[in-house]
Design a protein with these regions (language model features):
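Short Lys/Arg-enriched helix C-cap and helix-to-coil transition segments
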Residues: 33-41
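Intrinsic disorder/low-complexity detector
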Residues: 7-9, 35, 49
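Polyanion-binding surface elements
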Residues: 1-24, 54-55
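A short, Lys/Arg-enriched interface patch at domain edges and termini
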Residues: 47-56
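Alpha-helical DNA-recognition elements
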Residues: 28
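Residue-level recognition of specific faces of alpha-helices
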Residues: 21-24, 33, 47
């Protein structure tokens, strides 16, 4: 089964970047779209793949 949502740590591992980089991007309104669910940040796979298509 494929993951449909990634948390910050999972996405940082996928992209080989620091979780702190994702935090900074959110603060700067950069990076992929994200959702806050119950106080947690999650990234939808569709948004991740769209960001990858536009920036890779």
């Amino acid at each position: 089964m494929e993951l449909r949502h990634f948390n910050q740590v999972q996405l940082s591992r996928r992209w080989c970047i620091s979780p702190r980089t994702l935090e900074r991007w959110r603060w700067l309104r950069q990076g992929p779209n994200y959702l806050k669910v119950g106080g947690r940040v999650v990234y939808r796979l569709d948004d991740i793949e769209e960001y990858e298509r536009r920036h890779v």
